[in-house]
Amino acid sequence: MKGKFLKVSSLFVATLTTATLVSSPAANALSSKAMDNHPQQTQSSKQQTPKIKKGGNLKPLEQREHANVILPNNDRHQITDTTNGHYAPVTYIQVEAPTGTFIASGVVVGKDTLLTNKHVVDATHGDPHALKAFPSAINQDNYPNGGFTAEQITKYSGEGDLAIVKFSPNEQNKHIGEVVKPATMSNNAETQVNQNITVTGYPGDKPVATMWESKGKITYLKGEAMQYDLSTTGGNSGSPVFNEKNEVIGIHWGGVPNEFNGAVFINENVRNFLKQNIEDIHFANDDQPNNPDNPDNPNNPDNPNNPDNPNNPDEPNNPDNPNNPDNPDNGDNNNSDNPDAA
């Protein structure tokens, strides 16, 4: 599979720059060129509830090449209880462009942020307000957590098809990550080939704004590239890939017909990018004692209990340590190293 992936990857990179979302229940899609990696931002403000375009109003466009990859393992089922558990942060996306309204998927990962694909945000043509998000959507008549309007877009600085979207609060001054609990990200330390996974999102070949889950296994994993044997269609772009712990291990981007579907794997490089740009993103190991980033970890240099932390009262170099020869309160008044010694 490794050789085959390398062979097809350059082909698919080319298609990503010219292809993206679905714009109708029939899974039609938009073409758009890639944009730069700088954030697209508009003035932050509370937004009115976005207007929802229903299936009959969505304009069909030309079919995107490789948007639909239905494999022999076509184990897809509808999720009707969308507001509970790890399904709640899965989000239905609409992008209103000059050539039509297009649909995609995403996942809420912070108080005001979600993750999706670069090729999804490219459809905004530089106007973040064109992107609307409806977390936990049940169908085109039922959006239990309302809608949110994007205010800023930041694309992943690497090659992976990944983007961060920041949203304004809604009319009730609620943030998107307050109406749903943001997803937990996996540290992916134990992720490997043959593990069971699911991709959950809003495929365009199903009734508009209905959530579907597809089950399968990882077939390839290297760097930021992950492939799997489950089925998806246009509209699944930006869907989260969950492991068996319901942690996000990747963001789905598309696939190659009769071959595989793929995602941006959340490896160390991607994880660092996300942490740098999303202050409150939560990875599964963040609160573990052995996580070096955990402030409670005694090995964290910022932890006052770290013996190497100069602020640790037991640290010999701590000026407040009475055993420090430079401390005026050092009981050894005859210590020649103490400038205040008697």
UniProtKB/Swiss-Prot annotation:
Chief site of localization: secreted
What Gene Ontology molecular function terms does this protein carry?
Answer: serine-type endopeptidase activity
UniProt biased composition (Low complexity): 39-50, 286-342
sequence repeat start-end pairs = 289-291, 292-294, 295-297, 298-300, 301-303, 304-306, 307-309, 310-312, 316-318, 319-321, 322-324, 325-327, 328-330
- Which chain positions lie within coiled-coil regions? none
Catalytic reaction equation(s): Preferential cleavage: Glu-|-Xaa, Asp-|-Xaa
Matching Pfam families: Trypsin_2
Q: What class of enzyme is it?
A: hydrolase
Residues in the signal sequence? 1-29
Keyword match tRNA processing: no
Report the active site residues. 119, 161, 237
Domain of life from the UniProt record? Bacteria
Q: Which InterPro entries match?
A: Glutamyl_endopeptidase (IPR050966), Peptidase_S1_PA (IPR009003), Peptidase_S1_PA_chymotrypsin (IPR043504), Peptidase_S1B (IPR008256), Peptidase_S1B_tx (IPR008353), V8_his_AS (IPR028301), V8_ser_AS (IPR000126)
> Mind listing the UniProt keywords for this protein, alphabetically?
Hydrolase, Protease, Repeat, Secreted, Serine protease, Signal, Virulence, Zymogen
| Region named 13 X 3 AA repeats of P-[DN]-N | 289-330
Q: Which family does it belong to?
A: Belongs to the peptidase S1B family.
Query: Remarks, anything else?
Result: The cascade of activation of extracellular proteases proceeds from the metalloprotease aureolysin (aur), through SspA to SspB.
> Would you tell me the protein name for this molecule?
Glutamyl endopeptidase
